[in-house]
């Protein structure tokens, strides 16, 4: 039998509990429809509150604030409860149809009871959420690291550069600053120190952002790094498009005073595409970037740019000694002296100073240091650390060159000696001779100078002045390394330039050589006959060659470029030069060649022949046989002047460029009246004209003329002709007769009264007048005004020496927008310069003269005096304008 359990409970309590249960359970069923309506209304209210809250959150996040965790938690709860409510609402029609007895009962009492209970609980949850969703503050500023400091090398000797860059950046008008310079020069180090200095500036800037851009520009990667730095990341960022990311970044940064540091730019970074607001004086934001390409500064619209240069010798030595260490330097008394030579090989490049200094830090015998010099001189690429740490970094600039043409032209620069000033004209002539660039008239030179500009702006060449460039020694080693197929085929590119060698390389080395440079050595004689089946280039300029074996040229069938210039003892060439059947470029400039080699006329492919400064040449008869010749340079050449020479020149149908010196009046007249020869003349020197040749008339077709020189001639007037009609200066004209004439010099032309014809040379940059005793004025104001032409708009240098009768350069002030230098010496009658306060906008004008002349100089007014007096530079009375002492 089962047991019996007895429970004691009062009747009243039982009745109360049963009634409560019935009432509550009754509400689950009887109030179901009303409860469902209340649930839907509560859901709508909470969703509206969520949308309002999200709009407010988005607005705050655009200002760079970050949503509060409690707010994000509430939004997440709402997003979780919405589908649960919708599920209950979808069951409404089924559950309502089950109700009966006016909603007091259900056909399925258990199901309706459970459903009604879920509805009531959901109402309670929604109401609680609605109550919790009342936020006065939804986001707050997160004090992320305003500046993330970067590890940096010590600023050895670069402090002045840092101060200069920092001070320039802090100027109100500077928003974008570009730092450009060659690879390894310390641009990233400098930018890192700028970054770290912002941590000590206080709260002037809201945020400093560092981005490494690198060669492959990726806008979205830059955007991602900026957004991460802003600490406003969310899970949806990666799915956004580039345009939306840009908009988000812009809406945050426009409320901030930011600094953006972009390291290693190789192409324009479009700030609009990234979403970065442009810095302005009003928003106070700053952008600084580093690049190896100067042209990027222009593409980025910088307010200022700054070249990061190699260290000065003393500063370079300081850095090098810190890397080597005092113990090593003190381990042998000769090491410091030898170490200076090693350091000098680095030419102030911090990358090389660091790597080579570290390599030598534990080499404590003088023999090891001398060996280092030998390796760095003969084959620097083999030096420890060079191929692994130095040359690959520099090679990025080479790899960035857009064409094979640019790369070939760059490699060619390595044929010159270390630290050599390379004449731009020489480079262009070589490149034309090699066939690297277009050989058409006009195009070739322009293209050559464009290539030089690209290499300079790429920091692969350094521009010394308007005429010359230089290649940094370490960059040169990189070029040689590349040219030798990264050291695998060194014999292809034999460069022993400037080493004071007395002999040519061993015979065996010539067999595979393609380019050989032996310029600037002490070679006196060539007696060997190396077999050179692949040789294309042979540069022997500036040696002491007096003899070349007749067999030397026999085995050079591919030779294209041969430079024998500046060999002062070279008096003849072997006729066997005719066997160089591929030769296109030949320079005999500044040699003592006397006899025209008969074999030269066999060089049917010769395009370029340079005989400038060959005063001893006896004849050039037969030159018309060089039918392919395009460039002929005879400037200051001593060939006899006779009509047959002009006839031969006229037979050169392909001639495009001519430089020449003439002295016979009859030949000069024929030459100037020959339209074809005159039109291709690039430089003309007129010398030793006799007193009967008192007037020189130029034809108005010399539009190629760039240089015009007069010397030791008794001419008293220079005229301009249009065809056969002399053009009087009093007849106005707008014609430009010398559009490319940039240099004019006159020496010992004692009868000239004025040079007013120069008004027809609008692009004149240099004018030198020396010992013109009768010259009274340079430009006659009345004659010039009749032509309505303003002279000297491009003039950069004016040099007047020993012009005793000169009273005026021009009566009245002239504008000189480009003027950089005036030198006056021995012009006692000249008391006033054609200057007023506004004549020269440039701030770097220098006026050089003797102190006594400066003391008597008259000025247009006090303002002019105040403007130009500080530019005057006096040289002592016993020193001439060239710096030589005058003996009395």
UniProtKB/Swiss-Prot annotation:
Gene3D superfamilies: Helical domain of apoptotic protease-activating factors, P-loop containing nucleotide triphosphate hydrolases, Ribonuclease Inhibitor, Winged helix-like DNA-binding domain superfamily/Winged helix DNA-binding domain. The keyword Coiled coil applies. Residues 22-66 form a coiled coil. One of its GO terms (cellular component) is cytoplasm. ATP binds at residues 181-188. It comes from the Eukaryota. LRR repeats lie at residues 512-533, 534-555, 558-580, 582-604, 605-627. PANTHER family: NB-ARC DOMAIN-CONTAINING PROTEIN, NB-ARC DOMAIN-CONTAINING PROTEIN-RELATED. Probable disease resistance protein. This is Probable disease resistance protein At5g63020. It comes from Arabidopsis thaliana (Mouse-ear cress).
């Amino acid at each position: 039998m089962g047991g019996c359990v007895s429970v004691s409970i009062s009747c009243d309590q039982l009745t109360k509990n049963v009634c409560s249960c019935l009432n509550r359970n009754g509400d689950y069923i009887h109030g179901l429809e009303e409860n469902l309506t209340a649930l839907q209304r509560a859901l709508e209210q909470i969703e509206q509150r969520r949308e309002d809250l999200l709009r407010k959150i988005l607005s705050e996040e655009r200002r760079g604030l970050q949503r509060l965790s409690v707010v994000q938690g509430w939004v997440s709860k709402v997003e979780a409860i919405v589908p649960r409510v919708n599920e209950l609402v979808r069951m409404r029609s089924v559950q309502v149809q089950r109700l009966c007895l006016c909603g007091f009962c259900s056909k399925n009492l258990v199901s309706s009871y459970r459903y009604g209970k879920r509805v009531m609980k959901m109402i309670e949850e929604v109401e609680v959420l609605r109550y919790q969703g009342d936020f006065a503050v939804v986001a707050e500023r997160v004090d992320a690291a305003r500046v993330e400091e970067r590890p940096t090398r010590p600023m050895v000797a670069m402090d002045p550069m840092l101060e200069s860059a920092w001070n320039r950046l802090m100027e109100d008008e500077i928003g974008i600053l570009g730092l450009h310079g060659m690879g390894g020069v310390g641009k990233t180090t400098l930018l890192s120190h700028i970054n770290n200095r912002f941590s000590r500036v206080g709260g002037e800037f809201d945020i400093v952002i560092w981005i490494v851009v690198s060669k492959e520009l990726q806008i979205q990667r830059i955007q991602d790094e900026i957004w991460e730095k802003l600490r406003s990341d969310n899970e949806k960022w990666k799915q956004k498009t580039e345009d939306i990311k840009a908009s988000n970044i812009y809406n945050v940064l426009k409320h901030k005073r930011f600094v953006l540091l972009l390291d290693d730019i190789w192409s324009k970074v479009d700030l609009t595409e990234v979403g970065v607001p442009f810095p302005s004086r009003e928003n106070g934001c700053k952008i600084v970037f580093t690049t190896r390409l100067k042209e990027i500064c222009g593409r980025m619209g910088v307010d200022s740019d700054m070249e990061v240069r190699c260290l000065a010798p003393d500063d370079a030595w300081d850095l090098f000694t810190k890397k080597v260490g005092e113990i090593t330097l003190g381990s042998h008394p000769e090491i410091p002296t030898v170490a200076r030579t090693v350091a000098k090989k680095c030419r102030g490049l911090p990358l090389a100073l660091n790597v080579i200094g570290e390599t030598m830090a534990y080499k404590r015998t003088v023999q090891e240091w001398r060996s280092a010099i030998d390796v760095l001189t003969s084959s620097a690429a083999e030096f420890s650390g060079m191929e692994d740490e130095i040359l690959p970094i520099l090679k990025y600039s080479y790899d960035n060159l857009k064409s094979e043409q640019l790369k070939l032209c760059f490699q060619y620069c390595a044929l010159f000696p270390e630290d050599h000033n390379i004449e731009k004209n020489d480079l262009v002539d070589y490149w034309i001779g090699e066939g690297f660039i277009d050989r058409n008239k006009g195009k070739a030179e322009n293209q050559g100078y464009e290539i030089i500009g690209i290499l300079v702006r790429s920091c692969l060449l350094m521009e010394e002045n308007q005429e010359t460039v230089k290649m940094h020694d370490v960059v040169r080693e990189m070029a040689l390394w590349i040219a030798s197929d990264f050291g695998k085929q060194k014999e292809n590119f034999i460069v022993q330039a400037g080493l004071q060698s007395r002999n040519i390389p061993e015979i065996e080395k010539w067999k595979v050589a393609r380019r050989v440079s032996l310029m600037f050595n002490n070679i006196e004689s060539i007696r060997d006959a190396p077999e050179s089946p692949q040789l294309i280039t042979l540069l022997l300029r500036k040696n002491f060659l007096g003899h070349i074996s007749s067999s030397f040229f026999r085995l050079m069938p591919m030779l294209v470029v041969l430079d024998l210039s500046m060999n002062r003892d070279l008096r003849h060439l072997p006729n066997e030069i005719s066997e160089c059947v591929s030769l296109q470029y030949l320079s005999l400039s500044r040699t003592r060649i006397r006899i025209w080699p008969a074999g030269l006329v066999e060089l049917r492919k010769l395009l370029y022949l340079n005989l400038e400064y060959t005063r001893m040449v006896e004849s050039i008869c037969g030159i018309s046989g060089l039918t392919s010749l395009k460039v002929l340079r005879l400037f200051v050449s001593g060939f006899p002047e006779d009509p047959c020479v002009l006839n031969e020149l006229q037979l050169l149908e392909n001639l495009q460029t001519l430089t020449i010196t003439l002295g016979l009046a009859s030949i000069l007249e024929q030459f100037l009246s020959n339209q074809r020869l005159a039109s291709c003349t690039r430089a003309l020197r007129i010398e030793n004209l006799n007193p009967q040749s008192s007037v020189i008339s130029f034809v108005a077709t010399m539009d190629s003329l760039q240089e015009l020189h007069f010397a030791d001639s008794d001419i008293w007037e220079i005229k301009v002709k249009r065809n056969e009609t002399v053009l009087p200066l009093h007849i106005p004209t707008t014609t430009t007769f010398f559009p490319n004439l940039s240099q004019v010099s006159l020496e010992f032309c004692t009868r000239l009264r004025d040079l007013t014809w120069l008004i027809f040379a609008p692009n004149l940059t240099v004018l030198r007048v020396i010992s013109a005793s009768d010259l009274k004025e340079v430009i006659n104001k009345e004659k010039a005004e009749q032509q309505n032409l303003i002279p000297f708009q491009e003039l950069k240098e004016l040099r007047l020496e020993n012009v005793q009768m000169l009273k005026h350069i021009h009566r009245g002030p002239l504008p000189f927008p480009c003027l950089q230098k005036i030198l006056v010496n021995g012009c006692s009658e000249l008391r006033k310069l054609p200057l007023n306060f506004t004549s020269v906008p440039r701030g770097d004008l220098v006026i050089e003269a003797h102190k006594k002349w400066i003391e008597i100089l008259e000025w247009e007014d006090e303002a002019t005096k105040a403007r130009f007096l500080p530019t005057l530079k006096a040289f002592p009375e016993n020193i001439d304008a060239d710096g030589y002492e005058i003996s009395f």
